[in-house]
């Protein structure tokens, strides 16, 4: 599973976003791969998209099968890991959606699709392993 971050979702919905072209190009590279959106990321994205029109683009993309909305942390009963991760990185003031994504990718077959450099340079798994990214960050 490739878990999409809000930075990517905003860029996919808002063509005026500086990263919109890169998001579309990367989406094309993911054809045939399963993309997921977590509820915390969906909530964060909803608030970042400033107009109803942009939110409608997101909803239609999800309804059209662009990604599935899932709750992987709850499915693995790993919410406690999210709290531990937030405590571990509290000096960096991470948001809940980022913590949730990191814990969601504890499974070896998953990665995060993001433009947020903290996933490459700051955030780590609870065991200290690097967070797996769907694409290298520029």
Task: Pin down the residues of each PLM region.
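Short active-site oxyanion
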Residues: 31-35, 67-69, 107-111
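Conserved glycosyltransferase catalytic-site signature
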Residues: 6, 39, 95-99
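Acidic, PIN/NYN-like endoribonuclease modules and their adjacent C-terminal/linker elements
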Residues: 1, 71, 108-138
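A generic structural signal for short hydrophobic patches within well-formed alpha-helices
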Residues: 9, 42, 119-120
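Active-site-proximal, substrate-binding regions of enzyme catalytic domains
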Residues: 10, 46-74, 78-84
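Hydrophobic residues within well-ordered alpha-helices
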Residues: 5, 45, 105-106
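Short, well-structured N-terminal submotif of metal-dependent ribonuclease cores
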Residues: 1-37, 49-62, 138
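Active-site neighborhoods of divalent-metal-dependent phosphate/nucleic-acid chemistry enzymes
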Residues: 71-117
């Amino acid at each position: 599973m490739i878990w999409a971050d809000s930075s990517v979702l905003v860029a996919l919905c808002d063509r005026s976003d500086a990263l919109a072209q890169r998001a579309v190009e990367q989406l094309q590279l993911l054809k045939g791969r399963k993309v997921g959106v977590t509820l915390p990321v969906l909530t964060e994205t909803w608030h970042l998209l400033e107009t109803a029109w942009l939110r409608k683009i997101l909803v239609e993309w999800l309804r059209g099968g662009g990604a599935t909305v899932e709750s992987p942390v709850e499915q693995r009963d790993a919410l406690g890991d999210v709290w531990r991760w937030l405590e571990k990185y509290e000096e960096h003031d991470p948001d809940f959606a980022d913590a949730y994504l990191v814990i969601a990718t504890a499974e070896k077959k998953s990665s995060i699709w993001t433009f947020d450099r903290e996933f490459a340079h700051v955030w780590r798994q609870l065991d200290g392993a690097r967070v797996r990214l769907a694409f290298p960050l520029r």
